[in-house]
From Swiss-Prot:
Key words, A-Z: 4Fe-4S, Amino-acid biosynthesis, Branched-chain amino acid biosynthesis, Iron, Iron-sulfur, Leucine biosynthesis, Lyase, Metal-binding
Annotated cofactor note: Binds 1 [4Fe-4S] cluster per subunit.
Quaternary structure annotation from Swiss-Prot or TrEMBL: Heterodimer of LeuC and LeuD.
GO biological process: L-leucine biosynthetic process
The keyword 4Fe-4S is assigned to this record: yes
Reported cofactor(s): [4Fe-4S] cluster
Listed GO MF terms: 3-isopropylmalate dehydratase activity; 4 iron, 4 sulfur cluster binding; metal ion binding
Protein purpose: Catalyzes the isomerization between 2-isopropylmalate and 3-isopropylmalate, via the formation of 2-isopropylmaleate.
Organism: Bradyrhizobium diazoefficiens (strain JCM 10833 / BCRC 13528 / IAM 13628 / NBRC 14792 / USDA 110)
Pathway it works in: Amino-acid biosynthesis; L-leucine biosynthesis; L-leucine from 3-methyl-2-oxobutanoate: step 2/4
NCBIfam families associated with the record: leuC, PRK05478.1, PRK12466.1
Superkingdom: Bacteria
Name listed for the protein in its UniProt record: 3-isopropylmalate dehydratase large subunit 1
Annotated EC: 4.2.1.33
């Protein structure tokens, strides 16, 4: 391989990651580490407020406020009227308002058009664009890769560094390509595909990698499904997930408030069409999934890798040879209150949560509403629907989705993160069981001793009206 500037240059076909990464390199720090320019810095109330306060304490200005955007989502109440935001949430929101105003940062505030979960509003406003490098102090920033962006979460010190310099130092990750090929079976969604992948490779299967998703199932998938796929990349340990932009991407982005307009749009699309892995590009790891073999998925344990088809049975630790894995399964079963070998379908549930940066977009609510239409939430079940943004809420109301949910006995709430991370006291009570469209089922994630099963919006709605984990394929019209 040739050497340029003291660095070995790979002249083989380039991956999508390499093309976007190389466009953002300001300086090489070492053989595998670079100083990168950041195109978009997204802030939320939890990390953004603290980062801005930290910057002010150092007497430093925000370097590029016009490339920084903020919204409250984590610590705000999603109750009607925003009633009951806890003291910490009120303080974080007040700080976010004060510091963004002082710094000239655009804030999409509560009840304003554009407010919502940061990983929902980025794409819908056109802040997230193909080829962009996007960071946020949140692990699910990988969501934006569904539009062909290089997007990843950063820590608190990195957040302050980006505010001060509009740059970040990063080690280039290894590359993995996951090819989803085949026709999507009835009742199977993007959420099922990514959960099945996590179950296949494990929660650490993507550690150290940037994962590019490809294949016929991805090419035929709408953008909101692609965002769901990329959202859970971090749950298989990956730094980022990304999908090559195509005509579906361009049609989605066109006309959004922050998207290029006029001649700039044509120039942008011309550039974006080059953002795909070359046919001879080499990946460090390849995984192929036949989507025709996938059925609706549901998690049973305390990690996203603890997943099985809805017609499956809870694993029996006695069948596991590896002592460490057997012990982990025993702990998970004890926490979840499940019997080894029992069918997962029919497991009684107490709560259903439809929301989060994974599954709170309009298409998600439509899928859940289709199941809820004409049915009632089962006795003893509390079911919440939390739209991902003010825009999603507005559009859902315009379609009458809110009425479908309310008539069925669901609680229709305001945009925010809510029960995904037990924010603002919005928790599943101890010992109770939830089916959730969110991304993590860790111990205590939805509240102390809360038991969480991850599923698609349609599967969650099926659980709400059945009072138990149910196969949505028997209910969809």
């Amino acid at each position: 391989m040739p050497i340029r500037g003291g660095r070995i240059v790979d002249t083989r076909g380039r991956t999508l990651l390499a093309k976007i990464w190389d466009q953002h390199v300001i300086a090489h720090v070492s053989d595998d580490t670079d100083l990168l320019h950041v195109d978009r810095h997204l802030l939320h109330d939890l990390g953004g407020s603290r980062g801005l306060i930290d910057l002010k304490s150092r007497n430093l200005p925000v370097h590029n406020p016009e490339l920084t955007f903020a919204t409250p989502d984590h610590a705000i109440s999603t109750a009607s009227g925003r009633a009951g935001t806890i003291t910490t949430g009120q303080e974080l929101l007040a700080a976010l308002r004060t510091e963004t105003s002082a710094s000239g940062i655009r804030l999409f505030d509560i009840d304003q058009p554009g407010q919502g979960i940061v990983h929902v509003i980025g794409p819908e406003l056109g802040l997230s664009l193909p080829g962009c490098l996007i960071v946020c102090g949140d692990s699910h920033t990988c969501t934006h890769g569904g539009l062909g962006a290089l997007a990843f979460g950063i820590g608190s010190s990195e957040l302050t560094h980006v505010l001060a310099t509009q740059t970040i130092i990063q080690r280039r990750p290894k590359t993995m390509r996951v090819t989803f090929d085949g026709r999507m079976p009835f009742g199977v969604t993007a959420k099922d595909l990514i959960l099945a992948l996590i179950g296949h490779v494990g929660a650490a299967g993507g550690t150290g990698y940037a994962v590019e998703y490809a294949g016929s199932a991805i090419r035929g998938m709408p953008i909101e499904g692609r965002l769901t796929i990329c959202n859970l990349s971090v749950e298989l340990g990956a730094k980022m997930g990304l999908i090559a932009p195509d005509q579906t991407t361009f049609d989605y982005v066109r006309g959004r408030p922050y998207a290029p307009q006029g001649e700039m749009w044509e120039r942008a699309v011309t550039a974006w069409r080059t953002l795909r892995s070359d046919s001879d590009a080499m990946f460090d790891r390849e995984v192929t999934i036949d989507v025709g073999t996938i059925i609706p998925q549901i998690t049973w344990g305390t990690s996203p890798e603890h997943v099985l088809g809805v017609d499956g049975r809870v694993p029996d630790p006695r069948d596991i040879a590896d002592p460490a894995r057997r012990g982990a399964i025993e702990i998970a079963l004890d926490y979840m209150g499940l019997k080894p070998g029992a069918p997962i379908a029919g497991t009684k549930v107490d709560w259903v949560f439809i929301g989060s940066c994974t599954n709170s977009r309009l298409s998600d609510l439509r899928a859940a509403a289709e199941v809820a239409r004409g049915r009632k939430v089962a006795p003893g079940v509390r079911a919440w629907v939390v739209p991902g943004s003010e825009t999603v809420k507005r559009d859902a109301v315009a379609e009458g989705l809110d009425k479908i949910f309310i008539d069925a006995g669901f609680e229709w709430r305001e945009p925010g993160c809510s029960m995904c991370l037990a924010a603002n006291g919005e928790t599943v009570p101890p010992g109770q069981r939830s089916v959730s469209t969110s991304n993590r089922n860790f111990i205590g994630r939805q509240g102390p001793r809360a038991r969480t099963h991850l599923a698609s919006p349609a599967m969650a709605a099926a659980a709400a009206v059945s009072g138990a984990i149910a196969d949505v394929r028997t209910m969809e019209r």
